[in-house]
């Protein structure tokens, strides 16, 4: 998202969007349609069908083949520079982060210590993409949770390509500011000094003392009112190195949507995680109407949960607040990276459950299915549920299933590992060499069926994207849906990918006539 407008006014910023394309669009993945048959004339079809094809190929060789077929995988390997926003507690770091990324993601409250983790967000300024890293308030004389926060800030300082050191114009220099400035002066990383809360030109006189920190000219900024940040971003881009120091940053916190039909226990689960009554909970279906974002620290990570109202009726037949709650549930799924689908295990699986599941898979989101109210199960119901799973959830065998009780806390500790595994696979990429080794073996075991009197050849495979994983097969003819399902099954047998949909897309390479024209 381009954030240049973030410093122009106080309008509502756009929320985080989600990828929900169900159809394969070559333009989305860097393919170029051309009249030269993908510029792949150097490759003979018989070469691709050779069982030994590609065995001794290097990564560079596979990249040449991908390029010949019109595919540029560089967007999957994009390495971005990082700017870390550091400073003592309550100087306005998270507000500045929100300005830098052009949307309200970082948590902003008017008391110290709100940001407890080192969290990264993607920003786009002047056509350049980079990471903006929000940190907790740094203080050298703290213990407990605040010591952990300070440690996260130090890690950010050690891995960032540029550091923005934020001080408070209204408060002036504190002892913590001086200690931190001395630490930054010893660092080899470029530092930009930002004097935040510069809300009036009458404060120019207050800027003078910040020169004593030894970090150069302070940039007067009002993050709250969107003033001065553009100059800081221009300077950040100027100071970025050609290659980033760290290439292993993941945007976070990861976004989770709790979804399911009304009264299935979404709010109860959220409250159990949060340890507080975050949402109004009642046995009346549809108690929670609006999604409520909650940042919650579980055992391993900080997560952003969205608690939704649930779908009582189909959107077309719902009325009033139910209609808008349904629309918001769609929005929550689109905005999430991972969906936890809650199903009431004590009742038969319903059409509503199936409908919400279809929304998730159509949107291409990572998925964990939580069978709630397990404390109400008896032996007869368990037998019935096993039968329902075989009939109604057979199309998502890849989804992790956890039996829980949000009321008693049963097995809730198993949810986070399942969520992490699903997201790891949602983000995962298989090398082109591994893909084509698997493809040769799968085709040798079961060749594609004849179509129109001709046997289609599968020439080559590459992974076009992640989130969700999309595998593109270049072929000489169309592949039947049943054969694509076979390939997906063999793909999962080899590589796993539990917890995420995997899309198998086919791109037919049309044959040329002897004169070089397509037939």
UniProtKB/Swiss-Prot annotation:
Signal peptide: none annotated. This is GTPase Der. Residues 428-510 form the KH-like domain. Keywords: GTP-binding, Nucleotide-binding, Repeat, Ribosome biogenesis. It comes from Corynebacterium glutamicum (strain ATCC 13032 / DSM 20300 / JCM 1318 / BCRC 11384 / CCUG 27702 / LMG 3730 / NBRC 12168 / NCIMB 10025 / NRRL B-2784 / 534). The lineage of its organism: Bacteria, Bacillati, Actinomycetota, Actinomycetes, Mycobacteriales. Associates with the 50S ribosomal subunit. GO terms for molecular function: GTP binding; ribosome binding. GTP 1 binds at residues 87-94, 134-138, 196-199. GTP 2 binds at residues 260-267, 307-311, 372-375. HAMAP family: GTPase_Der. GO terms for biological process: ribosome biogenesis.
């Amino acid at each position: 998202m381009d954030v240049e407008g973030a410093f122009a006014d106080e309008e509502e910023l756009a929320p985080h969007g989600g990828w929900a394309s169900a159809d394969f669009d070559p333009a989305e993945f860097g393919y170029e349609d051309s009249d030269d048959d993908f510029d792949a004339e150097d490759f003979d079809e018989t070469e691709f069908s050779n069982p030994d094809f590609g065995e001794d190929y290097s990564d560079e060789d596979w990249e040449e083949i991908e390029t010949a077929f019109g595919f540029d995988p560089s967007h999957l390997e994009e390495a971005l520079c990082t700017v870390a926003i550091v400073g003592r507690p309550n100087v306005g770091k998270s507000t500045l982060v929100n300005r830098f990324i052009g949307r309200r993601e970082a948590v902003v409250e008017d008391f110290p210590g709100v940001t407890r983790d080192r969290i990264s967000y993607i920003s786009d300024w002047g056509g350049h993409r980079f990471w903006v890293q929000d940190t907790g308030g740094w203080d050298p004389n703290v213990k407990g949770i605040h010591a952990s926060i300070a440690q996260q800030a130090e890690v950010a300082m050690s891995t960032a390509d540029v550091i923005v050191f934020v001080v408070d114009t209204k408060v002036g220099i504190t002892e913590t500011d001086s200690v931190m400035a001395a630490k930054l002066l010893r660092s080899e990383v470029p530092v930009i000094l930002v004097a935040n809360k510069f809300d009036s030109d009458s404060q120019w006189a207050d800027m003078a003392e910040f020169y004593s920190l030894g970090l150069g000219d302070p940039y007067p900024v009002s993050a709250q009112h969107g003033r001065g940040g553009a100059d800081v971003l221009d300077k950040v881009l100027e100071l970025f190195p050609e290659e980033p120091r760290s290439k292993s940053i993941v945007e976070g916190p990861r976004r989770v949507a709790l979804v399911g039909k009304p009264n299935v226990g979404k709010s109860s689960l959220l409250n159990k995680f949060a340890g507080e009554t975050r949402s109004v909970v009642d046995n009346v279906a549809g108690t929670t109407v609006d999604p409520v974002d909650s940042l919650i620290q579980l055992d391993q990570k900080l997560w952003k949960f969205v608690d939704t109202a649930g779908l009582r009726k189909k959107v077309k037949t719902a009325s009033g607040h139910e209609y808008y709650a349904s629309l918001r549930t769609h929005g929550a799924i689109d905005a999430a990276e991972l969906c936890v689908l809650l199903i009431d295990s004590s009742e038969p699986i319903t059409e509503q459950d199936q409908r919400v599941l279809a929304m998730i898979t159509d949107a291409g989101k990572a998925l964990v299915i939580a069978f709630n109210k397990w404390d109400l199960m008896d032996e007869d119901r368990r037998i019935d549920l096993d039968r329902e799973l075989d009939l109604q959830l057979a199309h998502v065998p890849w989804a992790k299933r956890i039996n829980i009780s949000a009321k008693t806390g049963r097995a809730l500790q198993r949810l986070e590992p399942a969520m992490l595994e699903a997201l790891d696979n949602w983000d995962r990429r298989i090398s082109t060499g591994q893909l084509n080794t698997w493809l040769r073996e799968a085709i040798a075991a079961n060749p594609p069926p004849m179509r129109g009197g001709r046997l289609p050849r599968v020439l080559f495979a590459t992974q076009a994207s992640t989130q969700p994983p999309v595998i593109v097969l270049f072929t000489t003819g169309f592949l039947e849906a049943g054969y694509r399902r076979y390939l997906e099954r063999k793909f999962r047998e080899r590589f796993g990918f539990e917890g995420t949909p995997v899309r198998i897309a086919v791109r037919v390479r049309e044959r040329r006539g002897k004169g070089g024209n397509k037939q």
